[in-house]
Protein backbone atom coordinates (compact mmCIF):
# COMPACT_ATOMS: atom_id res chain seq x y z
CA UNK A 1 0.00 0.00 0.00
CA UNK A 2 1.64 3.21 -1.18
CA UNK A 3 1.58 6.42 0.80
CA UNK A 4 -0.88 8.78 -0.95
CA UNK A 5 0.66 11.68 -2.82
CA UNK A 6 -0.65 14.46 -5.01
CA UNK A 7 0.92 15.00 -8.42
CA UNK A 8 -0.06 15.53 -12.05
CA UNK A 9 -1.87 12.18 -12.09
CA UNK A 10 -3.22 11.88 -8.55
CA UNK A 11 -5.40 14.05 -6.30
CA UNK A 12 -5.31 13.86 -2.50
CA UNK A 13 -8.16 15.35 -0.44
CA UNK A 14 -7.81 15.62 3.34
CA UNK A 15 -10.82 14.60 5.42
CA UNK A 16 -9.20 15.76 8.65
CA UNK A 17 -11.05 18.29 10.77
CA UNK A 18 -14.05 18.30 13.09
CA UNK A 19 -16.30 15.26 12.81
CA UNK A 20 -19.52 14.25 14.57
CA UNK A 21 -18.90 11.79 17.40
CA UNK A 22 -20.87 9.55 19.74
CA UNK A 23 -19.85 6.98 22.32
CA UNK A 24 -21.29 3.55 21.80
CA UNK A 25 -21.18 0.46 23.95
CA UNK A 26 -19.92 -3.08 23.59
CA UNK A 27 -22.73 -3.72 21.10
CA UNK A 28 -21.00 -3.84 17.73
CA UNK A 29 -23.72 -2.39 15.50
CA UNK A 30 -25.46 -0.17 18.02
CA UNK A 31 -26.16 2.69 15.59
CA UNK A 32 -27.45 2.73 12.03
CA UNK A 33 -24.47 3.88 9.93
CA UNK A 34 -26.83 5.20 7.26
CA UNK A 35 -28.35 7.76 9.64
CA UNK A 36 -26.90 10.73 11.55
CA UNK A 37 -25.46 9.80 14.93
CA UNK A 38 -27.79 10.54 17.87
CA UNK A 39 -26.73 13.27 20.31
CA UNK A 40 -23.45 13.75 18.46
CA UNK A 41 -20.72 16.00 19.83
CA UNK A 42 -17.79 17.54 17.92
CA UNK A 43 -14.48 15.67 17.86
CA UNK A 44 -11.17 16.47 16.18
CA UNK A 45 -9.58 14.11 13.64
CA UNK A 46 -6.82 12.97 13.74
CA UNK A 47 -6.54 12.66 17.51
CA UNK A 48 -7.40 10.40 20.39
CA UNK A 49 -10.92 11.11 21.60
CA UNK A 50 -10.06 10.43 25.25
CA UNK A 51 -8.84 13.87 26.34
CA UNK A 52 -10.89 16.17 24.12
CA UNK A 53 -13.67 16.86 26.64
CA UNK A 54 -12.77 17.32 30.29
CA UNK A 55 -16.40 18.05 31.24
CA UNK A 56 -16.90 14.31 31.57
CA UNK A 57 -14.82 11.24 32.39
CA UNK A 58 -16.84 9.20 29.90
CA UNK A 59 -14.35 9.64 27.06
CA UNK A 60 -11.33 8.97 29.23
CA UNK A 61 -12.76 5.78 30.70
CA UNK A 62 -14.76 4.56 27.72
CA UNK A 63 -14.90 0.84 27.03
CA UNK A 64 -16.18 -0.38 23.69
CA UNK A 65 -17.16 1.18 20.39
CA UNK A 66 -16.97 4.87 19.51
CA UNK A 67 -18.58 6.34 16.40
CA UNK A 68 -17.43 9.04 13.98
CA UNK A 69 -19.30 10.61 11.11
CA UNK A 70 -18.94 13.29 8.44
CA UNK A 71 -20.15 14.05 4.92
CA UNK A 72 -17.86 13.60 1.93
CA UNK A 73 -18.18 15.14 -1.52
CA UNK A 74 -16.11 14.05 -4.50
CA UNK A 75 -15.33 16.94 -6.90
CA UNK A 76 -16.79 16.63 -10.38
CA UNK A 77 -13.36 16.89 -12.00
CA UNK A 78 -12.53 13.45 -10.57
CA UNK A 79 -14.79 11.79 -13.15
CA UNK A 80 -13.16 8.77 -14.75
CA UNK A 81 -10.69 8.27 -11.89
CA UNK A 82 -10.30 5.47 -9.40
CA UNK A 83 -11.23 6.75 -5.90
CA UNK A 84 -9.79 5.37 -2.65
CA UNK A 85 -10.59 6.15 0.99
CA UNK A 86 -7.54 5.71 3.25
CA UNK A 87 -7.02 5.77 7.02
CA UNK A 88 -3.53 6.17 8.49
CA UNK A 89 -4.68 4.27 11.58
CA UNK A 90 -7.78 3.66 13.68
CA UNK A 91 -7.34 2.16 17.16
CA UNK A 92 -7.86 -0.75 17.67
CA UNK A 93 -10.57 -2.35 15.50
CA UNK A 94 -12.35 -0.37 12.80
CA UNK A 95 -15.45 -0.64 10.64
CA UNK A 96 -16.21 1.87 7.87
CA UNK A 97 -19.43 2.56 5.96
CA UNK A 98 -20.46 4.83 3.07
CA UNK A 99 -24.19 5.62 3.08
CA UNK A 100 -24.69 2.61 5.34
CA UNK A 101 -22.76 0.15 3.16
CA UNK A 102 -19.85 -1.58 4.88
CA UNK A 103 -16.68 -0.92 2.85
CA UNK A 104 -13.80 -1.81 5.19
CA UNK A 105 -12.87 -3.60 8.39
CA UNK A 106 -9.43 -3.63 10.00
CA UNK A 107 -7.90 -5.02 13.18
CA UNK A 108 -4.77 -3.31 14.46
CA UNK A 109 -4.51 0.29 15.57
CA UNK A 110 -1.13 1.34 14.13
CA UNK A 111 -1.05 0.64 10.40
CA UNK A 112 -3.02 2.03 7.44
CA UNK A 113 -5.91 0.49 5.57
CA UNK A 114 -7.98 1.62 2.61
CA UNK A 115 -11.01 0.84 0.46
CA UNK A 116 -11.71 1.38 -3.23
CA UNK A 117 -14.92 3.46 -3.27
CA UNK A 118 -15.07 4.23 -7.00
CA UNK A 119 -18.39 2.45 -7.41
CA UNK A 120 -19.95 4.10 -4.34
CA UNK A 121 -18.81 7.71 -4.62
CA UNK A 122 -19.76 9.40 -7.86
CA UNK A 123 -18.26 12.79 -8.85
CA UNK A 124 -20.36 15.65 -7.49
CA UNK A 125 -22.18 13.41 -5.03
CA UNK A 126 -22.23 13.87 -1.24
CA UNK A 127 -22.29 10.75 0.92
CA UNK A 128 -22.32 9.95 4.63
CA UNK A 129 -19.07 8.46 5.95
CA UNK A 130 -19.38 6.55 9.23
CA UNK A 131 -16.52 5.00 11.20
CA UNK A 132 -16.76 2.85 14.32
CA UNK A 133 -13.70 1.97 16.39
CA UNK A 134 -13.39 -0.46 19.28
CA UNK A 135 -10.85 0.36 21.99
CA UNK A 136 -11.09 -2.94 23.87
CA UNK A 137 -7.85 -4.82 24.51
CA UNK A 138 -7.69 -8.45 25.58
CA UNK A 139 -5.73 -11.64 25.01
CA UNK A 140 -6.42 -11.53 21.26
CA UNK A 141 -5.25 -7.96 20.60
CA UNK A 142 -1.88 -6.30 20.18
CA UNK A 143 -1.11 -4.64 22.51
CA UNK A 144 -2.46 -7.21 24.96
CA UNK A 145 -5.10 -6.48 27.56
CA UNK A 146 -5.95 -8.52 30.62
CA UNK A 147 -9.32 -10.19 31.02
CA UNK A 148 -12.05 -9.66 33.62
CA UNK A 149 -10.80 -10.49 37.10
CA UNK A 150 -7.20 -9.69 36.20
CA UNK A 151 -5.32 -6.47 36.94
CA UNK A 152 -4.11 -3.71 34.69
CA UNK A 153 -0.36 -3.17 34.39
CA UNK A 154 1.07 -2.06 37.75
CA UNK A 155 -2.39 -2.45 39.31
CA UNK A 156 -2.80 -3.44 42.95
CA UNK A 157 -4.92 -6.07 44.59
CA UNK A 158 -5.67 -7.76 47.88
CA UNK A 159 -6.59 -11.09 46.39
CA UNK A 160 -8.76 -13.33 48.53
CA UNK A 161 -10.37 -10.63 50.66
CA UNK A 162 -14.15 -11.21 50.32
CA UNK A 163 -15.08 -7.57 49.91
CA UNK A 164 -12.40 -6.97 47.27
CA UNK A 165 -13.37 -10.08 45.32
CA UNK A 166 -17.04 -9.08 45.44
CA UNK A 167 -16.20 -5.58 44.25
CA UNK A 168 -14.19 -6.95 41.33
CA UNK A 169 -17.12 -9.11 40.27
CA UNK A 170 -19.48 -6.14 40.49
CA UNK A 171 -17.19 -3.67 38.71
CA UNK A 172 -18.25 -2.22 35.38
CA UNK A 173 -16.51 -3.66 32.31
CA UNK A 174 -13.26 -1.81 31.66
CA UNK A 175 -9.97 -2.08 29.83
CA UNK A 176 -7.15 -3.61 31.82
CA UNK A 177 -4.12 -2.93 29.64
CA UNK A 178 -1.13 -5.18 30.22
CA UNK A 179 1.17 -2.37 29.11
CA UNK A 180 2.53 0.80 30.67
CA UNK A 181 1.04 3.49 28.44
CA UNK A 182 -2.45 4.92 28.22
CA UNK A 183 -4.84 3.06 25.94
CA UNK A 184 -5.63 6.00 23.68
CA UNK A 185 -8.16 5.29 20.93
CA UNK A 186 -9.83 6.86 17.94
CA UNK A 187 -8.91 7.96 14.42
CA UNK A 188 -5.28 8.70 15.17
CA UNK A 189 -3.77 9.48 11.79
CA UNK A 190 -4.78 11.35 8.62
CA UNK A 191 -7.87 10.37 6.65
CA UNK A 192 -7.63 11.05 2.92
CA UNK A 193 -9.61 10.53 -0.23
CA UNK A 194 -7.26 10.08 -3.16
CA UNK A 195 -7.57 9.33 -6.85
CA UNK A 196 -5.52 7.41 -9.39
CA UNK A 197 -6.01 6.60 -13.07
CA UNK A 198 -7.94 3.40 -13.78
CA UNK A 199 -4.66 1.61 -14.46
CA UNK A 200 -2.31 2.56 -11.68
CA UNK A 201 0.92 1.93 -9.79
CA UNK A 202 0.07 -0.34 -6.87
CA UNK A 203 3.38 -0.91 -5.09
CA UNK A 204 7.07 0.00 -5.31
CA UNK A 205 10.07 -1.80 -3.82
CA UNK A 206 13.59 -0.37 -3.82
CA UNK A 207 16.70 -2.31 -2.77
CA UNK A 208 19.83 -0.14 -3.06
CA UNK A 209 23.45 -1.20 -2.62
CA UNK A 210 26.39 0.97 -1.63
CA UNK A 211 28.09 0.39 -5.01
CA UNK A 212 25.27 2.40 -6.60
CA UNK A 213 23.25 -0.48 -8.01
CA UNK A 214 19.55 -0.25 -7.23
CA UNK A 215 17.15 -3.13 -7.69
CA UNK A 216 13.56 -2.00 -8.17
CA UNK A 217 10.18 -3.65 -8.60
CA UNK A 218 6.96 -1.87 -9.58
CA UNK A 219 3.60 -3.59 -9.22
CA UNK A 220 0.90 -2.22 -11.53
CA UNK A 221 -2.60 -3.00 -12.69
CA UNK A 222 -3.10 -3.27 -16.43
CA UNK A 223 -0.47 -3.56 -19.14
CA UNK A 224 0.81 0.00 -19.63
CA UNK A 225 4.61 0.24 -19.96
CA UNK A 226 6.64 1.32 -16.92
CA UNK A 227 9.47 3.85 -17.05
CA UNK A 228 11.61 4.69 -14.02
CA UNK A 229 14.06 7.54 -13.53
CA UNK A 230 16.36 8.13 -10.57
CA UNK A 231 16.52 11.79 -9.54
CA UNK A 232 19.23 13.14 -7.28
CA UNK A 233 18.62 15.51 -4.38
CA UNK A 234 18.58 18.47 -6.78
CA UNK A 235 16.01 16.86 -9.08
CA UNK A 236 18.48 15.92 -11.82
CA UNK A 237 18.03 12.62 -13.66
CA UNK A 238 21.03 10.36 -13.01
CA UNK A 239 19.77 6.96 -14.25
CA UNK A 240 16.74 5.41 -15.95
CA UNK A 241 15.28 2.09 -17.01
CA UNK A 242 12.23 0.46 -18.59
CA UNK A 243 10.06 -2.34 -17.22
CA UNK A 244 8.36 -3.35 -14.00
CA UNK A 245 11.58 -4.63 -12.44
CA UNK A 246 15.29 -4.40 -12.99
CA UNK A 247 18.56 -2.91 -11.83
CA UNK A 248 19.75 0.68 -12.22
CA UNK A 249 23.24 1.96 -11.51
CA UNK A 250 23.70 5.42 -10.00
CA UNK A 251 27.05 6.93 -10.98
CA UNK A 252 29.12 8.53 -8.22
CA UNK A 253 26.50 7.50 -5.69
CA UNK A 254 25.95 9.48 -2.48
CA UNK A 255 25.29 7.34 0.59
CA UNK A 256 22.64 7.94 3.25
CA UNK A 257 24.03 8.31 6.77
CA UNK A 258 22.62 9.59 10.07
CA UNK A 259 23.60 13.06 11.14
CA UNK A 260 26.12 14.54 11.57
CA UNK A 261 26.67 12.74 8.27
CA UNK A 262 24.56 13.44 5.19
CA UNK A 263 21.15 11.70 4.93
CA UNK A 264 21.18 11.89 1.13
CA UNK A 265 17.89 11.01 -0.56
CA UNK A 266 17.18 9.99 -4.13
CA UNK A 267 13.77 9.77 -5.80
CA UNK A 268 12.57 6.95 -8.04
CA UNK A 269 10.21 8.72 -10.47
CA UNK A 270 7.83 6.16 -11.96
CA UNK A 271 5.40 6.50 -14.86
CA UNK A 272 2.92 3.84 -15.93
CA UNK A 273 0.53 4.96 -18.65
CA UNK A 274 -1.30 7.95 -17.20
CA UNK A 275 -0.13 7.31 -13.63
CA UNK A 276 2.88 8.84 -11.87
CA UNK A 277 4.45 8.11 -8.49
CA UNK A 278 7.60 9.31 -6.70
CA UNK A 279 9.31 6.99 -4.20
CA UNK A 280 12.15 8.47 -2.14
CA UNK A 281 14.98 6.20 -1.01
CA UNK A 282 18.45 6.35 0.44
CA UNK A 283 21.46 4.26 -0.50
CA UNK A 284 22.90 2.56 2.57
CA UNK A 285 23.70 -0.91 3.86
CA UNK A 286 23.00 -2.36 7.29
CA UNK A 287 24.32 -5.70 8.53
CA UNK A 288 25.52 -7.60 11.57
CA UNK A 289 29.05 -8.96 11.37
CA UNK A 290 30.36 -10.74 14.43
CA UNK A 291 29.66 -8.50 17.41
CA UNK A 292 29.37 -5.33 15.34
CA UNK A 293 26.51 -3.59 13.57
CA UNK A 294 27.78 -2.09 10.33
CA UNK A 295 26.14 0.77 8.47
CA UNK A 296 27.76 1.32 5.08
CA UNK A 297 30.50 -1.02 6.27
CA UNK A 298 31.36 1.08 9.34
CA UNK A 299 30.82 0.00 12.99
CA UNK A 300 27.78 1.81 14.34
CA UNK A 301 26.92 2.92 17.87
CA UNK A 302 23.28 3.70 18.64
CA UNK A 303 22.66 6.78 20.81
CA UNK A 304 18.92 6.72 21.04
CA UNK A 305 15.61 7.41 22.66
CA UNK A 306 12.61 5.19 23.19
CA UNK A 307 9.56 7.33 22.50
CA UNK A 308 5.79 7.33 22.64
CA UNK A 309 3.24 9.07 20.49
CA UNK A 310 1.80 10.89 23.48
CA UNK A 311 0.97 14.52 24.15
CA UNK A 312 -1.63 16.60 25.94
CA UNK A 313 -5.10 17.08 24.41
CA UNK A 314 -4.61 14.99 21.27
CA UNK A 315 -3.17 11.91 22.99
CA UNK A 316 -1.62 9.68 20.32
CA UNK A 317 -3.00 11.71 17.44
CA UNK A 318 -0.73 12.70 14.56
CA UNK A 319 0.86 16.10 15.09
CA UNK A 320 3.37 17.38 12.50
CA UNK A 321 4.39 20.28 14.74
CA UNK A 322 5.28 17.94 17.60
CA UNK A 323 7.17 15.60 15.26
CA UNK A 324 9.33 18.46 13.98
CA UNK A 325 9.85 19.70 17.54
CA UNK A 326 10.91 16.24 18.72
CA UNK A 327 13.28 15.66 15.81
CA UNK A 328 14.98 18.98 16.53
CA UNK A 329 15.31 18.00 20.19
CA UNK A 330 16.85 14.68 19.13
CA UNK A 331 19.45 16.61 17.14
CA UNK A 332 19.99 19.00 20.08
CA UNK A 333 20.59 15.99 22.35
CA UNK A 334 23.31 14.66 19.99
CA UNK A 335 21.31 11.44 19.62
CA UNK A 336 21.14 9.46 16.38
CA UNK A 337 18.35 6.93 16.87
CA UNK A 338 14.74 6.32 17.93
CA UNK A 339 12.95 3.15 18.93
CA UNK A 340 9.25 3.24 18.04
CA UNK A 341 8.16 1.79 21.36
CA UNK A 342 5.78 0.01 21.33
CA UNK A 343 4.09 0.18 17.93
CA UNK A 344 4.71 1.51 14.42
CA UNK A 345 4.51 5.32 14.43
CA UNK A 346 2.81 7.57 11.87
CA UNK A 347 4.25 7.24 8.37
CA UNK A 348 5.09 10.92 8.27
CA UNK A 349 7.49 10.50 11.19
CA UNK A 350 9.60 8.04 9.17
CA UNK A 351 9.68 10.48 6.24
CA UNK A 352 11.06 13.07 8.64
CA UNK A 353 13.67 10.64 9.98
CA UNK A 354 14.72 9.80 6.41
CA UNK A 355 15.20 13.47 5.69
CA UNK A 356 16.82 14.36 9.01
CA UNK A 357 19.12 11.37 9.32
CA UNK A 358 17.74 9.58 12.38
CA UNK A 359 18.05 5.80 12.70
CA UNK A 360 14.86 3.90 13.57
CA UNK A 361 14.24 0.60 15.35
CA UNK A 362 10.75 -0.19 14.04
CA UNK A 363 8.59 -2.16 16.50
CA UNK A 364 5.32 -4.07 16.24
CA UNK A 365 2.57 -3.47 18.86
CA UNK A 366 3.29 -6.87 20.43
CA UNK A 367 3.57 -5.79 24.05
CA UNK A 368 2.05 -7.46 27.11
CA UNK A 369 2.45 -11.10 26.01
CA UNK A 370 2.79 -12.76 29.37
CA UNK A 371 1.12 -13.16 32.72
CA UNK A 372 3.67 -14.86 34.93
CA UNK A 373 4.27 -18.51 35.65
CA UNK A 374 0.56 -19.29 36.02
CA UNK A 375 -0.38 -18.40 32.42
CA UNK A 376 1.25 -19.71 29.25
CA UNK A 377 0.42 -17.03 26.67
CA UNK A 378 1.76 -19.13 23.81
CA UNK A 379 -0.86 -21.79 24.50
CA UNK A 380 -3.73 -19.65 25.81
CA UNK A 381 -3.59 -16.33 23.89
CA UNK A 382 -4.97 -16.47 20.31
CA UNK A 383 -2.36 -14.05 18.98
CA UNK A 384 -0.15 -15.73 16.39
CA UNK A 385 -2.17 -14.98 13.25
CA UNK A 386 -2.76 -11.35 14.24
CA UNK A 387 0.92 -10.98 15.10
CA UNK A 388 1.91 -12.16 11.63
CA UNK A 389 -0.56 -9.66 10.17
CA UNK A 390 0.78 -6.62 12.03
CA UNK A 391 4.39 -7.63 11.33
CA UNK A 392 3.68 -7.97 7.62
CA UNK A 393 1.80 -4.66 7.51
CA UNK A 394 4.65 -2.85 9.27
CA UNK A 395 7.37 -4.24 7.01
CA UNK A 396 5.36 -3.67 3.83
CA UNK A 397 4.61 -0.09 4.86
CA UNK A 398 8.16 0.83 5.94
CA UNK A 399 10.35 -1.31 3.65
CA UNK A 400 11.70 1.59 1.56
CA UNK A 401 12.71 3.89 4.43
CA UNK A 402 16.50 4.21 4.76
CA UNK A 403 16.05 5.35 8.37
CA UNK A 404 14.66 1.93 9.34
CA UNK A 405 17.67 -0.24 10.16
CA UNK A 406 16.22 -2.78 12.60
CA UNK A 407 12.90 -4.60 13.01
CA UNK A 408 11.66 -5.34 16.53
CA UNK A 409 9.20 -8.23 16.76
CA UNK A 410 7.83 -7.03 20.10
CA UNK A 411 8.49 -5.84 23.62
CA UNK A 412 9.09 -7.71 26.86
CA UNK A 413 7.25 -10.99 26.35
CA UNK A 414 7.50 -13.83 28.84
CA UNK A 415 10.59 -15.74 27.69
CA UNK A 416 11.60 -17.52 30.91
CA UNK A 417 8.58 -19.43 32.28
CA UNK A 418 7.83 -21.38 29.09
CA UNK A 419 11.12 -21.08 27.21
CA UNK A 420 10.53 -23.69 24.51
CA UNK A 421 7.00 -22.49 23.77
CA UNK A 422 8.33 -18.94 23.61
CA UNK A 423 11.01 -19.93 21.13
CA UNK A 424 8.49 -21.85 19.03
CA UNK A 425 6.29 -18.73 18.91
CA UNK A 426 8.94 -16.09 18.23
CA UNK A 427 11.39 -17.85 15.95
CA UNK A 428 8.89 -18.26 13.07
CA UNK A 429 8.20 -14.51 13.35
CA UNK A 430 11.95 -13.86 13.16
CA UNK A 431 12.13 -15.95 10.00
CA UNK A 432 9.02 -14.27 8.57
CA UNK A 433 10.52 -10.82 9.06
CA UNK A 434 13.61 -11.81 7.11
CA UNK A 435 11.46 -13.33 4.37
CA UNK A 436 9.24 -10.26 4.05
CA UNK A 437 11.95 -7.59 4.05
CA UNK A 438 13.49 -7.11 0.60
CA UNK A 439 16.44 -5.28 2.23
CA UNK A 440 16.99 -8.07 4.80
CA UNK A 441 17.53 -5.78 7.78
CA UNK A 442 18.54 -7.24 11.14
CA UNK A 443 15.71 -8.51 13.35
CA UNK A 444 15.47 -8.41 17.13
CA UNK A 445 13.10 -9.07 20.02
CA UNK A 446 13.28 -6.74 23.01
CA UNK A 447 13.43 -8.78 26.22
CA UNK A 448 12.54 -7.72 29.75
CA UNK A 449 14.37 -8.22 33.04
CA UNK A 450 14.17 -11.99 33.47
CA UNK A 451 16.20 -15.07 34.24
CA UNK A 452 18.32 -14.68 31.12
CA UNK A 453 19.83 -18.13 31.61
CA UNK A 454 16.42 -19.68 30.91
CA UNK A 455 15.62 -17.40 27.97
CA UNK A 456 16.59 -19.36 24.83
CA UNK A 457 15.02 -16.89 22.38
CA UNK A 458 16.77 -13.54 22.82
CA UNK A 459 20.20 -15.04 22.17
CA UNK A 460 19.05 -16.20 18.70
CA UNK A 461 18.20 -12.70 17.46
CA UNK A 462 20.55 -10.79 15.13
CA UNK A 463 21.09 -8.15 17.81
CA UNK A 464 20.49 -8.81 21.52
CA UNK A 465 18.24 -6.06 22.90
CA UNK A 466 17.78 -6.01 26.66
CA UNK A 467 15.50 -3.82 28.79
CA UNK A 468 17.06 -3.52 32.23
CA UNK A 469 16.26 -1.42 35.28
CA UNK A 470 19.19 -2.15 37.59
CA UNK A 471 19.05 0.58 40.20
CA UNK A 472 15.36 1.29 39.73
CA UNK A 473 12.89 -1.61 39.84
CA UNK A 474 15.54 -3.87 41.36
CA UNK A 475 18.45 -2.94 43.63
CA UNK A 476 16.53 0.30 43.93
CA UNK A 477 18.67 3.35 44.56
CA UNK A 478 21.84 1.33 45.21
CA UNK A 479 23.96 2.09 42.16
CA UNK A 480 26.96 0.12 43.44
CA UNK A 481 24.83 -3.02 43.63
CA UNK A 482 23.13 -2.11 40.35
CA UNK A 483 26.45 -1.94 38.51
CA UNK A 484 27.57 -5.23 40.07
CA UNK A 485 24.36 -6.94 38.96
CA UNK A 486 24.56 -5.45 35.49
CA UNK A 487 28.11 -6.72 35.02
CA UNK A 488 27.14 -10.19 36.21
CA UNK A 489 24.57 -10.29 33.43
CA UNK A 490 26.81 -8.68 30.81
CA UNK A 491 29.36 -11.43 31.42
CA UNK A 492 26.67 -13.88 30.31
CA UNK A 493 25.87 -11.94 27.14
CA UNK A 494 29.57 -11.72 26.27
CA UNK A 495 29.52 -15.49 25.87
CA UNK A 496 26.79 -15.30 23.20
CA UNK A 497 29.12 -13.55 20.71
CA UNK A 498 26.40 -11.21 19.49
CA UNK A 499 26.13 -7.42 19.39
CA UNK A 500 24.24 -6.30 22.50
CA UNK A 501 22.54 -3.03 23.31
CA UNK A 502 20.40 -1.61 26.06
CA UNK A 503 17.04 -1.11 24.41
CA UNK A 504 15.46 0.40 27.53
CA UNK A 505 16.69 1.72 30.88
CA UNK A 506 15.71 4.69 32.98
CA UNK A 507 14.61 6.20 36.28
CA UNK A 508 11.42 8.07 37.16
CA UNK A 509 12.34 11.71 37.69
CA UNK A 510 10.09 14.46 38.98
CA UNK A 511 11.07 17.69 37.26
CA UNK A 512 12.23 20.24 39.82
CA UNK A 513 12.82 17.70 42.61
CA UNK A 514 16.39 18.12 43.89
CA UNK A 515 18.23 16.30 46.67
CA UNK A 516 21.76 16.62 48.00
CA UNK A 517 22.36 12.89 47.98
CA UNK A 518 20.97 11.87 44.58
CA UNK A 519 17.86 10.21 46.02
CA UNK A 520 15.42 8.30 43.82
CA UNK A 521 12.95 10.43 41.83
CA UNK A 522 15.26 13.45 41.97
CA UNK A 523 16.93 15.00 38.94
CA UNK A 524 20.29 14.29 40.56
CA UNK A 525 19.50 10.57 40.77
CA UNK A 526 18.64 10.46 37.06
CA UNK A 527 22.10 11.85 36.30
CA UNK A 528 23.77 9.36 38.65
CA UNK A 529 21.74 6.47 37.21
CA UNK A 530 22.89 7.14 33.66
CA UNK A 531 26.44 8.11 34.63
CA UNK A 532 27.08 4.85 36.47
CA UNK A 533 25.42 2.44 34.03
CA UNK A 534 26.78 4.10 30.90
CA UNK A 535 30.31 3.79 32.27
CA UNK A 536 29.82 0.01 32.41
CA UNK A 537 28.54 -0.10 28.82
CA UNK A 538 31.67 1.66 27.62
CA UNK A 539 33.91 -1.14 28.94
CA UNK A 540 32.36 -3.75 26.63
CA UNK A 541 33.55 -3.72 22.98
CA UNK A 542 30.52 -5.72 21.81
CA UNK A 543 28.04 -3.32 23.42
CA UNK A 544 26.69 -1.38 20.43
CA UNK A 545 24.13 1.07 21.73
CA UNK A 546 21.84 2.59 24.32
CA UNK A 547 18.19 3.59 24.05
CA UNK A 548 17.12 5.55 27.12
CA UNK A 549 13.62 5.27 28.55
CA UNK A 550 12.04 7.63 27.76
CA UNK A 551 12.31 10.63 25.50
CA UNK A 552 9.55 12.46 27.40
CA UNK A 553 7.13 11.87 30.27
CA UNK A 554 3.91 10.27 29.08
CA UNK A 555 0.44 9.27 30.19
CA UNK A 556 -0.34 5.79 31.53
CA UNK A 557 -3.19 3.86 33.06
CA UNK A 558 -3.75 5.07 36.62
CA UNK A 559 -2.38 2.98 39.46
CA UNK A 560 -0.33 3.15 42.67
CA UNK A 561 2.97 2.95 40.75
CA UNK A 562 2.21 5.98 38.57
CA UNK A 563 1.59 9.61 39.59
CA UNK A 564 0.25 11.47 36.57
CA UNK A 565 1.94 9.01 34.22
CA UNK A 566 5.42 7.68 33.71
CA UNK A 567 8.10 10.20 34.70
CA UNK A 568 11.16 8.52 33.19
CA UNK A 569 11.34 11.10 30.43
CA UNK A 570 14.54 13.01 29.81
CA UNK A 571 12.13 15.77 28.82
CA UNK A 572 8.90 16.66 30.56
CA UNK A 573 5.70 15.95 28.67
CA UNK A 574 5.78 19.54 27.36
CA UNK A 575 9.41 19.03 26.23
CA UNK A 576 11.49 20.81 28.88
CA UNK A 577 14.84 19.07 29.49
CA UNK A 578 15.64 17.58 32.87
CA UNK A 579 19.10 17.51 34.38
CA UNK A 580 19.67 13.99 33.07
CA UNK A 581 19.18 15.22 29.52
CA UNK A 582 21.98 17.74 29.89
CA UNK A 583 24.25 14.93 31.12
CA UNK A 584 23.39 12.68 28.18
CA UNK A 585 23.72 15.53 25.71
CA UNK A 586 27.32 16.01 26.80
CA UNK A 587 28.00 12.26 26.82
CA UNK A 588 26.60 11.73 23.34
CA UNK A 589 28.53 14.70 21.96
CA UNK A 590 31.71 12.80 22.86
CA UNK A 591 30.60 9.50 21.25
CA UNK A 592 30.95 9.30 17.45
CA UNK A 593 28.28 7.51 15.42
CA UNK A 594 30.96 5.37 13.75
CA UNK A 595 34.06 3.74 15.17
CA UNK A 596 33.36 4.29 18.88
CA UNK A 597 34.46 0.75 19.75
CA UNK A 598 36.72 -0.30 16.89
Which positions does each model-derived feature cover?
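Substrate-binding clefts and catalytic carboxylate motifs of secreted carbohydrate-active enzymes
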Residues: 7-31, 171-172, 179-186, 193, ...
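The substrate-binding groove and active-site-proximal loops of carbohydrate-active enzymes
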Residues: 109, 176, 180, 308-321, ...
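Catalytic metal-binding/acid-base residues of hydrolase active sites
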Residues: 134-136, 343, 365, 410-414, ...
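Proline-centered loop/turn at the N-terminus of a beta-strand
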Residues: 357-359, 365, 440-442, 499
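Secreted/periplasmic carbohydrate-active enzymes, especially glycoside hydrolases
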Residues: 1-347, 352, 356-360, 390, ...
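Short low-complexity, flexible loop/linker segments enriched in glycine and/or proline
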Residues: 145-146, 352-356, 375-380, 384-387, ...
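Feature marks short, surface-exposed loop/turn motifs that line or immediately flank catalytic pockets
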Residues: 91, 135-137, 287, 308-309, ...
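Short hydrophobic/aromatic-enriched beta-strand-loop microsegments
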Residues: 106, 357-364, 462-468
Amino acid sequence: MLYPEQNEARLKLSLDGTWAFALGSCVEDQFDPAKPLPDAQPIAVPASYNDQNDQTTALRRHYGWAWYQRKVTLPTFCAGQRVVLRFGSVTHTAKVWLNGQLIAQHKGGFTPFEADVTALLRPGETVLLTVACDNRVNHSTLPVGNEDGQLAFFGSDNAGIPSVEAAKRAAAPQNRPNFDFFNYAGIHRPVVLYTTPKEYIEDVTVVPAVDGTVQYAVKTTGSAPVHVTVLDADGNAVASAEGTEGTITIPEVHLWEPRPGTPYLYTLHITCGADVYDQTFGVRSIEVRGTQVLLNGKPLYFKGFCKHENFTAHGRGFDPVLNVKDVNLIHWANANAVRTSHYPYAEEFYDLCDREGILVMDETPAVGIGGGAAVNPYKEYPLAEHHRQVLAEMIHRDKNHPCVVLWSLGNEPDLEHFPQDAYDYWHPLYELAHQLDPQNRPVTLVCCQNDYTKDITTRTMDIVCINRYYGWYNLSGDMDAACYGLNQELDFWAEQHKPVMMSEYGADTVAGLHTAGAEMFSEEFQVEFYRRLDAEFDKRPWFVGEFVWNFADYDTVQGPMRVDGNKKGLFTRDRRPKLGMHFLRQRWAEIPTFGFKE
